[in-house]
Every structure is written in C-alpha cells, then in structure tokens.
Regions:
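Conserved short "hinge" loops at termini or chain/domain junctions
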Residues: 1-52, 81-85
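Protruding loop/beta-arch "assembly-hinge" segments enriched in small, turn-prone residues
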Residues: 64-85
C-alpha cells in the first residue's frame, strides 16, 4: 500500500476515486515542500514523524482548516523541529 493510499484510508476514503487520490497527493507534496523549506533534510522525509506531518497536513487541508495546520505550539511545528535535529 502506498503512502497516499494509507493517508486516504486514515481520512476515511476506503475506495477513493482517482480525483481524490490526486488531490491528497497534492496535499502531501505541499507538506513535503513545507518541510524542506523549514530545513528538514531530504533523507528524513520518509520517517514516521514526516509521515505524521503529511497525514496531519492532508487531514487539515481536506477539512478546509488550512490556517489551523501551522501554529507556534502545534503538532506540525513540534514534529518539524524534531526532524531538523
């Protein structure tokens, strides 16, 4: 099962259409770009913490809660700071 399929499953899309898969893959790509811009090394993008960030990001984007993803004391910021070490 691919990473995007696992995230789709967690979001509740068990047998999703190709459009939703492409949409969620775009969210994952956004999360990866954000992590790279924050200084996360490319080799850490396949870690469990990076996967958690991608899942949180995709979930928030899917719900339309874009502004709530990145907060000073939020989970995404905490995970990224751990990945930067």
């Amino acid at each position: 099962m691919s990473e995007v399929d696992k995230i789709l499953y967690k979001l509740g899309y068990y047998d999703s259409d190709p459009h939703k898969k492409t949409e969620v893959q775009g969210y994952i790509d956004e999360a990866v770009e954000f992590m790279l811009d924050c200084g996360v090394k490319r080799e850490k993008l396949t870690s469990q913490r990076a996967y958690a960030i991608k899942s949180i990001w995709a979930d928030a984007r899917d719900k339309g809660e874009v502004d709530d993803v990145i907060k000073k004391d939020g989970m995404v910021v905490a995970l990224i700071s751990q990945l930067r070490r």
